[in-house]
Swiss-Prot record:
The modification N-acetylmethionine is found at M1. This is Dystrobrevin beta. Residues 520-562, 599-620 are annotated as: Disordered. It comes from Mus musculus. Interacts with dystrophin short form DP71 and syntrophins SNTG1 and SNTG2. Binds DTNBP1. Forms a specific complex composed of DMD, SNTB2 and SNTA1 in neuron; the interaction with SNTB2 and SNTA1 is DMD independent. Interacts with UTRN and dystrophin short form DP71 in the kidney and liver. Interacts with SNTB1, SNTB2 and SNTA1 in kidney and liver. Interacts with KIF5A. Interacts with HMG20A and HMG20B. Interacts with OLFM1. Interacts with PRKAR2B and PRKAR1A. Residues 429-519 form a coiled coil. SMART domains: ZnF_ZZ. Zn(2+) 2 binds at C258, C261, H280, H284. Gene3D superfamilies: 3.30.60.90, EF-hand. A zinc finger (ZZ-type) spans 238-294. The lineage of its organism: Eukaryota, Metazoa, Chordata, Craniata, Vertebrata.
Length: 659
C-alpha cells in the first residue's frame, strides 16, 4: 500500500511538472491576456520541444501511425497516443545533429500529460483523432501558412468548401489550449465563435480562409495564435535602444514606441507589465516593432517612399487555386496485373498508358520489351508528376502515391515470381547472380573495414582530445613556468628599452657638445669650450618609437643624432649594445684627449679668466665643462652593463692616460 501511494504521488508530480514550471516563470504578471496566453503556450511549445517539429513532420507521423485512415470522430487510447508522440520525437532525434539531441523520454512525458490534461479532463483515457490532429498541428513549429492549409484540408469537403461544422469543432478543440493554461475566461469556446470569424460569408474557400486567419487583426478568439508565431520570430531580435522606464541600454524581443510621447520607447517586459513613467500613460497608443532600423535606413526608406520607388507590398500569402486537384487515376497509370501462366496473355503498357494484349514471346525477346515497357511507365509517371503543380498540397495525394507505389511494387514482384526462365539461359543467369553475390560480399567487407577504420580513428581522436591525469597534473606547472618566462621577457624588454633611450639621450648631448667644440675651435682656437654665447644645451626629444620595441638596430636608436656621432656609432646593424657602447667610449676618449690638449695649451688664459670669474662669484667655464664631461663619461660607463671589468679598466686607463 505504501509503494502504491508513492507511485501515485510520483505520477501526479509528473503530470503537474509542466504546470509547476510554467507558474515559476511568473507569466501571470503580464497585464494583457493576449500576450499572457501567447507566452504560456510558447513556453509549453519550447518545453515539449514541439518548436523543432514542423507541420510536415507531423503529417508524416500521422501517416506512419495510420491516423490518416481513421475518421475524425474515432477515439484512440492514451497508449496509442503515446506511440504517436514517441514516433514524433524519435524521428526528430534522427534529424538533429548529435550535439543537439533532446531527451525523448522527458519530452514524451511532458507532452502526453499536457494533452491528457487539456483534452481528457473527464479521465476517460480516450481522445478523438481530430483532437490530436488539431492540438499537434496548432502547437508544432513551422510556418503559420502551412499550418492553416493543413487545418483547412481537415475541415473542407471534396469541392474545396469549408464545412462550418468542422470549423466549429476545430475552434472547440483549439480553444482548449488557452483553457489548459488557465486562460479560459479570456479565450474560452462560445457557440458564436464561428460567426465571429466569418460573420457574412456562406461559402468559404482556401484563400478566403487564409485571408481571415492571417489578417491584422485576426479573429478575436484566435488572436493568440499569430502572436505566438511572432514571439518565436523576435526572441533573438536585438534593439540598440534604451528603455524609457527601466533604462536598460538595449532590448531583446519586441520594442514598443508611444505614438503620443516623443521618443518614448519601452521594452517588452515593461510594456507587458504596464509600467509607465513621466508624461506617458498606459492609455496611450503604442506601436509594436519586431525589428530595428537605423536612422539612415529610415531616411532612405522615407525618401524612396516619397519618390514612389518602394515596390508594392507583397500579399501575405500566395493565391491558391479555388478548385481542389483531382485524385490520381491509379487504374489508368498502373492497372492491376492478373496472375498468368506461360501460355497466357500479358499486358504491356506503352507510353500512352493504354493496355494492349500480346502473346508471350521467347525469353530473350521478351525481356527487352518488358524493360522498355517499364521505362515507358516510369516516364509517364514522371511526366504526370511534373504536370501536378501541387503534389504535396493535399494530404490525400500522398495516400494515392503510396498506393500507386505499392501496386507498382506488387506488379514487379508478381512478374519476378511468375516468370520462368528458359533452360538455355539458366547457367548464364546463375553465373551472373553468383558474380553479383560475390561483388556484394566484397563491397560489404570493404564497407565493414571502412566502418571499423572510422571507429578506430574516432576513438583515437577522442583519446587524444581527452587529457590524461599526468598531463592534467603537469599542465599547472607548465603554465606557471610559461607565465614566469613571459614576465621575465617583459622585464628584459623594458630594461632594453630603457637602455636604448638612455643611450640615445647621451648621444644627443654629445652631439650638442661636439658642435659647441667645433664652433669654438673655428672661432677662437685659444679659447676653451664653454657654454657661453647664449647657446643653450639642446634637450633630448623623446621618440614615440623608442620604447615600443627593443629589437631595432643601432641606426634606429641614433635617429636625430648628428653625423659625427652616427659615424662613430654606425659600425653595422648586427652589433649588440656592448660593442656600440665600446665604440662610443673610444670616440669620446679621442674627443676628450683633443679637448684636454686645448685646455692645457690655454692654461694661463684659463687661470686668468678663472680668477676673474671667481672674483665675480661665477665658476670657471673650463671647470664646468670638465665636470660635465666627467659626468657624461660616468653615465656612459654605467650603461655598459654587459661589459667586462677588463674592458672597463682599459677604458678608464685610456681616459686617465689621455688626461
Amino acid at each position: 500500500m505504501i509503494e502504491e501511494g508513492g507511485n501515485k504521488r510520483k505520477t501526479m508530480a509528473e503530470k503537474r511538472q509542466l504546470f509547476i514550471e510554467m507558474r515559476a516563470q511568473n507569466f501571470d504578471v503580464i497585464r494583457l491576456s493576449t500576450y499572457r496566453t501567447a507566452c504560456k503556450l510558447r513556453f509549453v511549445q519550447k518545453r515539449c520541444n514541439l518548436h523543432l517539429v514542423d507541420i510536415w513532420n507531423m503529417i508524416e507521423a500521422f501517416r506512419d501511425n495510420g491516423l490518416n485512415t481513421l475518421d475524425h470522430s474515432t477515439e484512440i487510447s492514451v497508449s496509442r497516443l503515446e506511440t504517436v508522440i514517441s514516433s514524433i520525437y524519435y524521428q526528430l532525434n534522427k534529424r538533429l545533429p548529435s550535439t543537439h539531441q533532446i531527451s525523448v523520454e522527458q519530452s514524451i512525458s511532458l507532452l502526453l500529460n499536457f494533452m491528457v490534461a487539456a483534452y481528457d479532463s473527464e479521465g476517460r483515457g480516450k481522445l478523438t483523432v481530430f483532437s490530436v490532429k488539431a492540438m499537434l498541428a496548432t502547437m508544432c513549429g513551422g510556418k503559420m501558412l502551412d499550418k492553416l492549409r493543413y487545418i483547412f484540408s481537415q475541415m473542407s469537403d471534396s469541392n474545396g468548401l469549408m464545412m462550418f461544422g468542422k470549423l466549429d469543432q476545430f475552434l472547440k478543440e483549439a480553444l482548449k489550449l488557452p483553457t489548459a493554461v488557465f486562460e479560459g475566461p479570456s479565450f474560452g469556446y462560445t457557440e458564436h465563435a464561428v460567426r465571429t470569424c466569418f460573420p457574412q460569408q456562406k461559402k468559404i474557400m482556401l484563400n478566403m480562409f487564409l485571408d481571415t486567419m492571417m489578417a491584422d487583426p485576426p479573429p478575436q478568439c484566435l488572436v493568440w495564435l499569430p502572436l505566438m508565431h511572432r514571439l518565436a520570430h523576435v526572441e533573438n531580435v536585438f534593439h540598440p535602444v534604451e528603455c524609457s522606464y527601466c533604462h536598460c541600454e538595449s532590448m531583446m524581443g519586441f520594442r514598443y514606441r508611444c505614438q503620443q510621447c516623443h521618443n518614448y520607447q519601452l521594452c517588452q517586459n515593461c510594456f507587458w507589465r504596464g509600467h509607465a513613467s513621466g508624461a506617458h500613460s498606459n492609455q496611450h497608443q503604442m506601436k509594436e516593432h519586431s525589428s530595428w532600423k537605423s536612422p539612415a535606413k529610415k531616411l532612405s526608406h522615407a525618401i524612396s517612399k516619397s519618390l514612389g520607388c518602394v515596390p508594392s507590398r507583397e500579399p501575405p500569402h500566395p493565391v491558391f487555386p479555388e478548385q481542389p486537384e483531382k485524385p490520381l487515376d491509379l487504374a489508368h497509370l498502373v492497372p492491376p496485373r492478373p496472375l498468368t501462366n506461360m501460355n497466357d496473355t500479358v499486358v504491356s503498357h506503352m507510353s500512352s498508358g493504354v493496355p494492349t494484349p500480346t502473346k508471350r514471346l521467347q525469353y530473350s525477346q521478351d525481356m527487352p520489351n518488358l524493360l522498355a515497357d517499364e521505362h515507358a511507365l516510369i516516364a509517364s509517371y514522371v511526366a504526370r508528376l511534373q504536370h501536378c503543380t501541387r503534389v504535396l498540397d493535399s494530404p490525400s495525394r500522398l495516400d494515392e502515391e503510396h498506393r500507386l507505389i505499392a501496386r507498382y511494387a506488387a506488379r514487379l514482384a508478381a512478374e519476378a515470381g511468375n516468370m520462368t526462365r528458359p533452360p538455355t539461359d539458366a547457367s548464364f543467369n546463375f553465373d551472373a547472380n553468383k558474380q553479383q553475390r560475390q561483388l556484394i560480399a566484397e563491397l560489404e567487407n570493404k564497407n565493414r573495414e571502412i566502418l571499423q577504420e572510422i571507429q578506430r580513428l574516432r576513438l583515437e581522436h577522442e583519446q587524444a582530445s581527452q587529457p590524461t591525469p599526468e598531463k592534467a597534473q603537469q599542465n599547472p606547472m607548465l603554465l606557471a613556468e610559461l607565465r614566469l618566462l613571459r614576465q621575465r621577457k617583459d622585464e628584459l624588454e623594458q630594461r632594453m628599452s630603457a637602455l636604448q633611450e638612455s643611450r640615445r639621450e647621451l648621444m644627443v648631448q654629445l652631439e650638442g657638445l661636439m658642435k659647441l667644440l667645433k664652433a669654438q675651435a673655428t672661432g677662437s682656437p685659444h679659447t676653451s669650450p664653454t657654454h657661453g654665447g647664449g647657446r643653450p644645451m639642446p634637450m633630448p626629444v623623446r621618440s614615440t618609437s623608442a620604447g615600443s620595441t627593443p629589437t631595432h638596430g643601432p641606426q634606429d636608436s641614433l635617429s636625430g643624432v648628428g653625423g659625427d656621432v652616427q659615424e662613430a656609432f654606425a659600425q653595422g646593424t648586427r652589433r649588440n649594445l656592448r660593442n656600440d657602447l665600446l665604440v662610443a667610449a673610444d670616440s669620446i676618449t679621442n674627443t676628450m684627449s683633443s679637448l684636454v690638449k686645448e685646455l692645457h695649451s690655454g692654461a694661463e688664459a684659463e687661470e686668468q679668466a678663472g680668477t676673474e670669474k671667481t672674483r665675480e662669484g661665477l665658476p670657471p667655464r673650463g671647470t664646468f665643462l670638465s665636470v660635465f664631461l666627467l659626468h657624461t663619461w660616468t653615465k656612459l660607463a654605467g650603461c655598459q652593463t654587459h661589459s667586462t671589468s677588463r674592458e672597463r679598466s682599459q677604458a678608464y686607463g685610456k681616459w686617465g692616460g689621455t688626461a
